[in-house]
Regions:
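Proteolytic processing junctions in secreted/extracellular precursors
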Residues: 4-7, 12-14, 252, 256, ...
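NAD-dependent ADP-ribosyltransferases
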Residues: 1, 5, 66-68, 84-90
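Structural alpha-beta junctions
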Residues: 36-42, 92-99, 173-180
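Helical scaffold of the NTase/Pol beta-like nucleotidyltransferase catalytic core
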Residues: 2-49
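Catalytic cores of NTP-dependent nucleotidyl/adenyl transfer enzymes across multiple folds
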Residues: 116, 123-262
Length: 275
């Protein structure tokens, strides 16, 4: 069996990546360590994407590991600067020099902390022990952690989290809106004004009347609700094209038009008359 070592690719030296994939069994201990040095609390609902969720009975490492740790971080509880200060304090307590701590663009990528956009990346000892190697932790800051939990869900064996994000965007475009993974549903006709950031509001706007957050959790649940929509094929067309290029099979619509129903009745009647 080949064990994949690659994970997040922020931290690297001239010799190669400084981080690796993390086994699902090591995720909890690693997050416990992060909580200890930062004072933050990350419940499982704040483990974004596939973090800690991949379990496959065949035992293959890739199917039982995550490339990095994605953590839903509430910007109202801690700022990026405060988090960096806490991480820096711990690193210094381990004898790491100031100059070695921060990545500096492309000039220095072998540091321990990388500050970029809405995220802080940290080269984290797996289960708190450097002997286990390191995994990249992505602290993903947001002003709306409830929305981000739903925006950055993992996937299923058939359709991953990226596939789900593409489907959300495809449906939103079909409804004359845009899906922002940071803000929610926005209206391009109103200067990208946010029109919904709660998933129980987003669900019916995208999938139709009666849809709830639970219907948006996976590609499969979204398609199951949406495929009765008369505009199903049009709504998923961009997503479907992307999936077919990736060799993934997409369910057909189950919507039955009036013409379809009439044709079905004629066929049924004809078969009865023949008998």
């Amino acid at each position: 069996m080949t064990i994949l070592k690659e994970g997040g690719n922020i931290f690297k030296s001239e010799q190669g990546p400084l981080t690796q994939r993390i086994a699902t069994k090591d995720v909890q201990a690693s997050i416990n360590f992060i909580e200890k040095i930062t004072g933050l609390v990350y419940d499982e609902e704040d483990w974004l994407g596939t973090t800690g969720k991949k379990n496959d009975p065949d035992g293959e490492f890739e199917k039982n590991s995550s490339g990095d740790l994605d953590l839903n971080t509430d910007a109202s509880k801690i700022s990026k600067e405060q988090l960096i200060a806490k991480l820096t304090s711990w690193l210094k307590s381990k004898g790491i020099d100031d100059e070695a701590i921060m990545n500096k663009g492309r000039k220095k990528t072998d540091g321990w902390i990388h500050n970029a956009g809405d995220q802080v990346h940290f080269r984290t000892p797996i289960a708190g022990n450097s002997k286990n190697g390191y995994v990249q932790t992505d602290f993903m800051f947001t002003n709306n952690p409830e929305f981000q939990r739903g925006a950055k869900r993992g996937g299923t064996p058939q359709f991953g989290g990226t596939d789900r994000a593409i489907l959300l965007s495809s449906i939103a475009r079909g409804r004359g809106l845009k899906f922002s993974p940071k803000f929610g549903l926005v209206d391009p006709a109103q200067g990208d004004e946010v029109v919904a950031s709660n998933w129980n509001d987003i669900a019916p706007m995208l999938l139709g009347k009666g849809a709830k957050e639970s219907d948006t959790i996976t590609v499969e649940t979204m398609l199951a609700f949406l495929k009765k929509d008369p505009n199903y094929e049009e709504l998923i067309a961009p997503w479907k094209e992307t999936m077919e290029k990736a060799g993934k099979q997409v369910p057909e619509s189950t919507f039955e038009s009036l013409a379809d129903k009439q044709l079905s009745r004629i066929v049924t009647l004809a078969s009865v008359l023949v008998k």
